[in-house]
Amino acid sequence: DALPISVLMQFIFTSCATICPLMSATFSHGQNALKEVHNRYRMYSISIDPEYDTPDRLAAYAKRNSASENWTFLTGSRGDIGKVMRAFDVLYQSNNKMYHQPYTFLRAHSDAPWIRIDGFLSVGELVHEFRIALRSMGTA
C-alpha cells in the first residue's frame, strides 16, 4: 500500500516584505526535514495577489526559495482565491493584503481534518506539528 499524501499550505504574495519571506523560508528550510518524516507530502503556497503574482513571478519566487518538486506555488482569479481564503477562514481586514496573517495549514491525508496553526513557525516547530498530525491519523 502506498502511503497517503500529506499537505502543508500557506497564503503568501511575492511582493510582501514582512511575513511572507519568513513563512517561505520555513517551508524552504523545512523541505528536507519534512521528507525525512514522511516522504509523500506536498507543500502549497497560494498567492493572495493574483494581479501581481503571475506564473512567471511565482516561478522566480519558487527558484529564490529553492522550492523542490514537492512545493507548488498557485495563483488564480481574484474570485477563486477569495473562495479558497473564505474556505480556510483567512480573510483579512478591509481586503488589504498588507493585513494578512501568518497561517499554516496541515493535513495528514485526504480523510483527515485540516489543522490550522496561527503565527510563525520555526522549521523545528513545523516538523513537530507535522509529526503530531501524522501520528494522530496513524500515518507516521
PLM feature spans:
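Hydrophobic beta-strand anchors of alpha/beta hydrolase catalytic cores
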Residues: 8-9, 43, 104
